[in-house]
Each structure stands twice: as structure tokens, then as C-alpha cells.
Amino acid sequence: MSNQHIEELNDQQIVRREKMTALAEQGIDPFGKRFDRTANSAELKEKYADKTKEELHELNETAIVAGRLMTKRGKGKVGFAHLQDREGQIQLYVRKDSVGEDNYEIFKKADLGDFIGVEGEVMRTDMGELSIKATKLTHLSKSLRPLPEKFHGLTDIETIYRKRHLDLISNRESFDRFVTRSKMISEIRRYLDGLDFLEVETPVLHNEAGGAAARPFVTHHNAQNIDMVLRIATELHLKRLIVGGMERVYEIGRIFRNEGMDATHNPEFTSIEVYQAYADYLDIMNLTEGIIQHAAKAVRGDGPIDYQGTEIRINEPFKRVHMVDAIKEVTGADFWPEMTVEEAIALAKEKQVPLEKHFISVGHIINAFFEEFVEETLVQPTFVFGHPVEVSPLAKKNPEDTRFTDRFELFIMTKEYANAFTELNDPIDQLSRFEAQAQAKELGDDEATGIDYDFVEALEYGMPPTGGLGIGIDRLCMLLTNTTTIRDVLLFPTMKP
């Protein structure tokens, strides 16, 4: 440690380092060693929930707990403290005549934030709080910095996102939200595993961005001296596995898109993609509904859920509507009759729909109508299906009306939560779609993809009829934890240095 660093320490930090040195001089390792616990705070509270003070005294049961010291009070020969572990907090009752002089000195000199182990009798105070009456204290690790202000938790938003460790220590609500996230993902896995899906892993580094319309991050592989991109989707590799005969696969993993950031978008995020051979988009609709309802029930219980004051009937069958019907219902514009691009553009101008240079077909304009007018009306869970071919380069055409695809998106609270379709397995059609995307890219569409000839070749070996699905894990977690910003469900959101 340099002198310059020591000079920058504040008074509290200096005192804590002095205590660290004092512990070492007493033969106590300031940063401890392994420690065996018999219970955590939640287990004790559950086990003894219905026991009175007198009953606990009669039982005379002991427990060994460990955690971070969050509060400490008292003077003389008696003290109280709260110890925090992963499940919550439990009160400590420490008497000098119970732990001995040396042990009590450890307690007196302990700072908030220190980790200690405690062995003692399970009791209830006169105020009715379940506590541990300590008989032995063990110093486990020294905290060299003071914790955030103890009564109000960490409230500075910038610090919450940059120093998530402090947020987790200080804010139980935040801690529980991330526990819920983990449980949600585990339940999704459990649901799919129960349906005989196989979890797989595919590359993060790709030679060509594909599987979605998004701008990629570009990096360089030094050993091979080639530019590569971080994946914007797992789709094309997973479909290669369907070609290979795996039939039912899914991957939960990180996706990277070099795009804007807002309340629902982070450049690095988690998605799940699922592919099922011999299925179509209607089968995948049912699968999607099952996944989301199973996850919601696991973390929020039966019945509807509240999201920011709106009751979401997530437990009921999801509404299903064709995109063209949804547009007609909201705007009156009818795209069912065949029309020219010029007629569609005129209709868009009449309704003041913003037009981009790469809108070169009726399909692009239909999609623009939907995004401009319909999305904001979709509050309850709604499957919107029948997207135009032009905005669905990997989806199979609807056999009854080839202007549209057998694709759907799930909307809840006006946001997209899932995207799925009957997969395109015709390699000739796939190449044609890729070429159309390449043309759009040349016209300025930064999100259009290039041509993945290797994937087209894989399709030429034959892929069975397949349904595929993608769900944004972070956005689903926001819904199920009643959170308004994606940063609150990402442990370490992207931040400027």
C-alpha cells in the first residue's frame, strides 16, 4: 500500500485499518477462515415462529450463524446487534459474562460491515424478537470501508448501478429482485427440460451477424487476423442443430447489440431461444404461453399480477390477433386488399406515418403502421401474428397468403416480450430473403443482416418443419418484479467509465 493511498484514507478508514492490525497482533486473522453454520436467519425464524419466550427457554436449543454486522448498540457489558446473511437478518444478544472478556472485546471492536460467526442459544427478547444469545463469537472478515448510511439504505442511483455490491448489502428489495430473477430462469429451464428440450451452448463470436435485425459489436481475432462480431442472436447456430437432428433445443445466453440504451434496452442482455422440430408457430404460441405462465406462477403465485398499478391477466389465455386486423381495428386502414407500394405510401402519408428510405414494399409500411399505432394499445398479453415477409427474413410464408409469414410477437404492457415463427427451411427462399436484407443494408438500413452462405448450405442438407422462439429474459424479469427500468434487473448494467 503506497503512502499516497494511505494519505487519501478518511478517518474511519484509518481506524478500521488500525483495528485490522490489532486483530493480527492478537493472533486473529483479520480475514478469517472457513466457518460451519447450522442455520441461516430464515430457517431459524421459520423453525421457531410459533415459540414463545418461555418455550424457547425450556427448549434451550443452540444455533451457529454467520453474516455481516449491520447494526450494533449497547454499552458496558451488554450489547445488541443484527447479523445479515443471504436470507435476511437476525438479532444478536451479547453479554460479557456469557461470551467471556476476550470474545466480548471482539464484539466491542467490531465495525459495521464486519463478518462474524456466532454460536449461542435461540431466544426471544421481551419485545418478542427472535435472537441468538451469544456464547461464542468468531471474527471472520474485516470491512475496511464503512457501509452506506444504515437506516435508509443506498439511494444514489448512479452508485446503485456502479457498485451493485453496496446496493445488495443495503437494499433488501434489490437483493430479493435478483433472487427472483434467478428463480425465474431456473423455472423456465425446469419447464423446458420437462418437455424434453435439450439446453445447448453456441458461439458468442460470429463471422457474420445474423438471426436478428440489429447493429453488431465488431471485434478482431488476433490469432486468425480476422474481424468478428459478437452475436446478435443465437438463432442460426441453433437451427444448425435442428438440421443435425437434435429436434428440441434451447439456449439461455448473452446477446450483444450495438444500439441505443433506454429503460428497456441494454447493449448486453439475456435471451432464450427455443427450437422444436415438427412444430409450427401455433405450437410455439402454446409453448410461449406455457413458459411465461409457469414462470409467473413460480415467482408471483396464481392469478393476475400487478405491474405499476395495472392488473395484468397473465394467468388467462392470451389474446391472438392478425397484424392486419389489429391495424384495421385501431386505424381503420385495411391492408387485406392487394395494393401497390405507391398506394401504401399514400395511405401512410394520409395517416402521418414516418417513412424511412428503406421502406421499399407494402410490407414495410404495414409494419410501420403497426409500430406507430397499435403497439401502444397492447396492454394485456396479446399474440400478434401474420407479419409481412419483408420484415421477417427467417420466417416461413403463410401458405394461404404469401405476403405474410407464420410469425408472431407477444406484447404485454405495450412492449414486445417474445418473437417466434414457423422457421423458414427452404434454402432457396432463405437465400432470396438474405439478398433482400443485403439490399436494404445498402440502402441505409443499419439493422439489416448480410448473407450467411454457410447457413444456407446447412439448410440445403434438409431441416424438418420447425417452430422457433425468442424471449427477452430481462424484460420478462422486469414484468415479474414490477420494475420500470432494465438496469434494475441487470446486476451490472452497461455504464460509462
UniProtKB/Swiss-Prot annotation:
Superkingdom, natural source: Bacteria
Question: Record's SUPFAM superfamilies?
Answer: Class II aaRS and biotin synthetases, Nucleic acid-binding proteins
- Molecular functions (GO terms): ATP binding; catalytic activity, acting on a protein; lysine-tRNA ligase activity; magnesium ion binding; transferase activity; tRNA binding
Gene3D superfamilies in the cross-refs: Bira Bifunctional Protein, Domain 2, Nucleic acid-binding proteins
Mind listing the UniProt keywords for this protein, alphabetically? Answer: Aminoacyl-tRNA synthetase, ATP-binding, Cytoplasm, Ligase, Magnesium, Metal-binding, Nucleotide-binding, Protein biosynthesis
Cofactor(s) needed for function: Mg(2+)
Location, primary (coarse class): cytoplasm
Q: How is the cofactor bound?
A: Binds 3 Mg(2+) ions per subunit.
A GO term from the CC aspect: cytosol
* Presence of keyword Transmembrane: no
UniProt: Mg(2+) 1 binding residues = E409, E416
| Enzyme class of the recorded protein, top EC level | ligase
Q: Record-annotated residues binding Mg(2+) 2? A: E416
Entry EC no(s): 6.1.1.6
Where in the cell does this protein reside? Answer: Cytoplasm
Reply yes or no: does the keyword Ligase apply. Answer: yes
GO term, biological process aspect, one: lysyl-tRNA aminoacylation
PANTHER family in the cross-refs: LYSINE--TRNA LIGASE, CHLOROPLASTIC_MITOCHONDRIAL, LYSYL-TRNA SYNTHETASE
The record's listing under HAMAP family reads: Lys_tRNA_synth_class2
Concerning its family, UniProt says: Belongs to the class-II aminoacyl-tRNA synthetase family.
Instruction: Please give the name of this protein.
Output: Lysine--tRNA ligase
Organism name: Streptococcus pyogenes serotype M1
Please name the gene that encodes this protein. lysS
